[in-house]
Amino acid sequence: EEVKLTKRAYGWPEDAHFLVPPRALEHMREAVDRGADAESEWHARFDAYRAAHPELAEQFDNALDGRLPSGWDAGLPSYDEADGPMATRKASGAALNAIADHLPWLLGGSADLAPSNNPLLEGSGDFGPEDYAGRNVRWGIREHVMAAASTGMALHGGLRPYAATFFVFTDYARPAIRLAALMRQPVIYVMTHDSIGLGEDGPTHQPIEHLAALRAMPGLRIIRPADANETVEAWREAIVRRDGPTMLVLTRQGVPVIRVDGPGRAIGLQLGAYILEDADDADPDLILVASGSEVALALEARRALIDSGVATRVVSMPSWEIFREQEAAYQHEVFPPDVPNRLAIEAGVSFGWREWVGDAGAVIGIDTFGASAPAGELFQQYGYSVDNVVAAAR
């Protein structure tokens, strides 16, 4: 009855179903015609532009279609042990700039933490009314706006956005991150200061539950690299991915550059987890699995365990999400079902690690909030030491 009364008030037929008033229909058809004319004009102008500037037109096509030009990753750095210790946030900045030299449509910025997050593109200027060609976006202390606008840029196409802040401040950006994951938009999040390694700023700024909380989000790929070289490969993975957002979780503090023999980091990180060092000439009795800054600790503990007669494997596991995508045969190669003795080491809540260590395994994690002290003291206090890892392994 209310619908009929509304139609009567407008002078429309009261019993017509799916009514489109003639004036509305005429208006919409005019809009369609205007749009078709505008599109035709745009294509004519772009065809002329393509004829005059073929290389720039190809760049434009690549940007809109998400195609990576040949050699886009040729300038990515690699690091030796002598380059360490190096914070993974610093290695991230170097990798980002190397990629940006080949991808002019890559742009982004930080929520007022650029000197700490290392997201600045050198020589690219700031985006703003005075310079729309600038590629550094100064978002201010507006994490949600930054993440939401980055999703909008990805939805439009033609731009590849990244957004940076402290890892703990993902709390302010989470709804926008969730929508990027829901809509499968390839936004890249650069989240630094990833643990109690933040130090004196204390528990308000130390992310404890954030890895577990964000790993629970469908479609969001988390990568927490162990060192500078894994960080470079994490950027390569993030750029290649087109079907959803990727979050790089990076250290404030310097971490060793880990020597790796064999196939190298690219293959390992592309699989989500890989055997970094294995038991010497024997099947492992114990598997130590870690991510990020705790991988170096796992390697130190392995040496002590090997010396005491425990055949120990170390697995670097930068990305649970990528590892879950691998075939069962590879997963069992990394975590043999007949090796139940497993110890996970990560500077965050232990929640979730049972998926990988099983009921017989153990986890060195932090299931309380942090504290204010130098990073080295905090790691010792919370049990991130060779002695504690060896004791837990036994």
Feature-to-residue mapping (PLM):
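Thiamine diphosphate
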Residues: 1-25, 107, 114-212, 230-233, 240-394
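Conserved acidic/glycine
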Residues: 1-142, 148, 152, 287, ...
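Active-site glycine- and acidic-residue-rich loops that bind
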Residues: 84-90, 225-232, 296, 323
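Short alpha-helical segments and helix-capping/turn motifs at coil-helix boundaries
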Residues: 89-98, 148, 172-176, 232-236, ...
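Short coil/turn connectors at secondary-structure junctions
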Residues: 102-106, 131-135, 156-160, 183-188, ...
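General beta-strand structural signal in soluble alpha/beta enzymes
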Residues: 109-110, 139, 162-163, 189-191, ...
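Residue-level signal for short, function-critical loop segments
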Residues: 112-114, 165-167, 193, 252, ...
